Amino acid sequence: MPWRNWGRTHSATPRQVVRPHDAGEVAELIATTRQRGGTVKPVGAGHSFSGIAVADDVQLDMSAMRGLLGVDAERRHVTLKGGTPLFEIPELLAPHHLAMANLGDVDRQTITGAISTGTHGTGLAFGGISTTVTAATVVTGTGDVVHIGDDDPDLAAVALGLGALGVVVDVTLACVDAFHLHAEETPMSADDAIGGFLDRVRSCDHHEFYWFPHTDCALGKTNTRLGSLAEVSGPSRLRRWIDDELLSNKVFGVLCEAGSRVPSLVPSIAQVSGRALSGRSYTDSSTRVFVSSRTVRFREMEYAVDLDAVPSVLREIRSMIDRRRYCLLYTSDA
């Protein structure tokens, strides 16, 4: 059966698709495949834009390995099966009054896919999801089941290893007490967004902005961490649905489709989208503020540069887009 990743950048037709339920089944699959000289490639949600999950032989689908394995309430550590999607984790943690310390704005990935590919959120004081890993269980390329503890020098390599050391079948995360976030979304000029970026990321818990190429329009988002008893406030549920689902996904999706079919329309679409930006503020649980609904498919790439160089790099990217006449609808910095 053909497989495609979420961004439609890669596809594959594996010879066999297997959905194991535990580490023992994974170990048996790897051992038998190794004996015949074959290869096994694990896949989660397929949300990586790279070809890391492309399987030519055996595709190991992690979707049957999901759920909570254990909680250490005193240490705030939780152990999850490797195929657990990020969007299922908040409900698993809620009875224990815990939350993940940081998240990106997409939660479709599996937990092991997220850590293995470096999924991250924002905030200079908070690392990516892989930095919260305190232990993991791995099935190696020889079919051995190995537990990696927090004192093991290989832990960092397993936590953010692109699957190079084996299949991560469960992972233990250091969590935090449940908390709320207060969000401020502010339309601003691209010059202001870029010029004020360093000050904002250094003074705020979490800051990011989205810039619409071919315009001077940007939308900044700043999140402030609050206790779990902070009052939930902001737009009504209907207003948020209109903003987040109807406008940001359905209407924007139609505009993106039009731009992909007629690239010459992209600058005009960007101008319309940029002028439609509006500010809002709201307070809610950390997950509901961190995560955004993303049904419009997109393709992205990321570079790591020195923090102080970010403004000049962004200005050069902006100049290059104009100079080379690339047709892009929006970019973000997080």
Where are the model-predicted features located?
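Flexible, glycine/proline-enriched loop segments at strand-loop-helix junctions
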Residues: 15-16, 75-80, 103-106, 123-125, ...
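Generic non-transmembrane alpha-helical segments
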Residues: 32, 36, 312-325
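Structural signature of FAD isoalloxazine-binding scaffolds in flavoprotein oxidoreductases
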Residues: 50-69, 123-142, 167-174
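C-terminal substrate-binding/cap subdomain adjacent to the FAD-binding core in PCMH-type
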Residues: 116, 134-320
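Conserved small/polar residues in nucleotide/adenosyl-binding loops
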Residues: 330-334
